[in-house]
């Protein structure tokens, strides 16, 4: 150990070992360092023990937060006169120096730096700072956790500060979070407090039920068939020779002798009953058909020839109707009567009333002319 250092603690020993060694006079440190609370370092300075401070390690460290106090040992807080409390932060003369009670309240000292206020009528609070305003008079009118505000009682009316998800004068209305219809694909929206949830139908998932579940994820199709996902369903595109929902069925192989003349594509076979006299053979008495009479209907609907026939028939019908209407209108404008007993193409005038205007009326069929207006051949006037 270097000369001139007398250490009484293990901490100081570690300090000495870590410090660089240099020659120091023995009386440079020991003469002024408080060796009860520290030790001399090789550089001649005092190294204080934990809880002590100062140039010579002569001062203890107070409790953190101690305001008006001192210590005799480390981490103490001994209050000065007139102060109290754990941190010596409470004034024992609080009611005499400057009363904390407001609005005319009376301060009562309880000892240990504590006090209480006796408030006048109409006021309350620790320091009589609150007035019995609209909130107190209404008796906590705000609902669903709302906070009543009346400017500490000095406002004329109160207001309710509502929590998220509620509205109204007293926070009594729960906001309908399903009003905007956030759930998709026919899902049911369940309203909550400032939130909603979607009850998804089968085949959908997600917060808004927008995810179509993959029904092909479990690989339901057999025989190596390709799966096509649908809404809560799937289709299997089966290879040739297989059928069924999951291609689990093996289709029978058709007889080439009976299907050689059948065109490709899906067909519907219908057996046509025989008509006319039926030849009988001796013994059996059954119908003998050498060639099967089969009618096959393609699924494509009308053929091209049938569609053309329908269009031509419609055009001819429309032309005939239009021609008949035009001819009838033309004959009516020229005064030509069609064959029939109810039309008189030209009016008749009496000889004595020629060159005068007359009202023309149509006579019923078979009605004779008046005797004073006999018809005069060659004396007619066209309309």
Swiss-Prot record:
It comes from Sus scrofa. The gene is DLK2. It is a single-pass type I membrane protein. Regulates adipogenesis. It is found in: Membrane. InterPro entries: EGF-like_Ca-bd_dom, EGF-like_CS, EGF-like_dom, EGF-type_Asp/Asn_hydroxyl_site, EGF_Ca-bd_CS, Notch_Cell-Fate_Det. The keyword NADP does not apply. Glycans are attached at residue 157. Keywords: Calcium, Disulfide bond, EGF-like domain, Glycoprotein, Membrane, Repeat, Signal, Transmembrane, Transmembrane helix. Residues 27-58, 62-89, 91-129, 131-172, 174-210, 212-248 form the EGF-like domain. Residues 27-306 are extracellular. It comes from the Eukaryota. This is Protein delta homolog 2. Residues 1-26 form the signal peptide. GO terms for biological process: negative regulation of Notch signaling pathway; regulation of fat cell differentiation. The chain crosses the membrane at residues 307-327. Residues 328-383 are cytoplasmic. GO terms for molecular function: calcium ion binding; identical protein binding; Notch binding. Disulfide bonds join 29-40, 33-46, 48-57, 66-71, 79-88, 95-107, 101-117, 119-128, 135-148, 142-160, 162-171, 178-189, 183-198, 200-209, 216-227, 221-236, 238-247. Gene3D superfamilies: Laminin. Pfam families: EGF (PF00008), EGF_DL_JAG (PF21700), hEGF (PF12661). GO terms for cellular component: membrane.
């Amino acid at each position: 150990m270097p000369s001139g250092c007398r250490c009484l603690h293990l901490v100081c020993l570690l300090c000495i070992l870590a410090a660089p060694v240099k020659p120091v006079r023995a009386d440079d440190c020991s003469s002024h360092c408080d060796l009860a609370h520290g030790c001399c370092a090789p550089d001649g300075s005092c190294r204080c023990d934990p809880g002590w401070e100062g140039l010579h390690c002569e001062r203890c460290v107070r409790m953190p937060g101690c305001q008006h106090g001192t210590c005799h040992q480390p981490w103490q807080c001994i209050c000065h006169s007139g102060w109290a409390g754990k941190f010596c932060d409470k004034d024992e003369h609080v009611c005499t120096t400057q009363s904390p009670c407001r609005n005319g309240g009376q301060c009562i000292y309880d000892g240990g730096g504590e006090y209480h206020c006796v408030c006048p009528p109409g006021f309350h609070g620790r320091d009589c700072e609150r007035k019995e305003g609209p909130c107190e008079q209404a008796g906590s009118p705000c609902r669903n956790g709302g906070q009543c505000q009346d400017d500490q009682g000095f406002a004329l009316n109160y207001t309710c500060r509502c929590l998220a998800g509620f509205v109204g004068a007293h926070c009594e209305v729960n906001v309908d979070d399903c009003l905007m219809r956030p759930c998709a694909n026919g899902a049911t929206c369940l309203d909550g407090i400032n939130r909603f949830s979607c009850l998804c139908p089968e085949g959908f998932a997600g917060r808004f039920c927008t995810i179509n579940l993959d029904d092909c994820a479990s690989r339901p199709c057999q025989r190596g068939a390709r799966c096509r996902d649908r809404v809560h369903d799937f289709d299997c595109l089966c290879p040739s020779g297989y059928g069924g929902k999951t291609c689990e069925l093996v289709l029978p192989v058709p007889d080439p002798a009976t299907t050689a003349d059948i065109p490709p594509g899906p067909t519907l076979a219908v057996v046509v009953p025989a008509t006319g006299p039926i030849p009988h053979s001796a013994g059996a008495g059954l119908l003998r058909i050498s060639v099967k009479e089969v009618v096959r209907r393609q699924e494509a609907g009308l053929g091209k020839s049938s569609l053309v026939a329908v269009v031509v028939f419609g055009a001819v019908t429309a032309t005939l109707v239009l021609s008949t209407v035009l001819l009838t209108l033309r004959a009516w404008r020229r005064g030509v009567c069609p064959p029939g007993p109810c039309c008189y193409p030209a009016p008749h005038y009496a000889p004595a009333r020629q060159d005068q205007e007359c009202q023309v009326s149509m006579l019923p069929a078979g009605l004779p002319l008046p005797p004073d207006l006999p018809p005069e051949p060659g004396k007619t006037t066209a309309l």
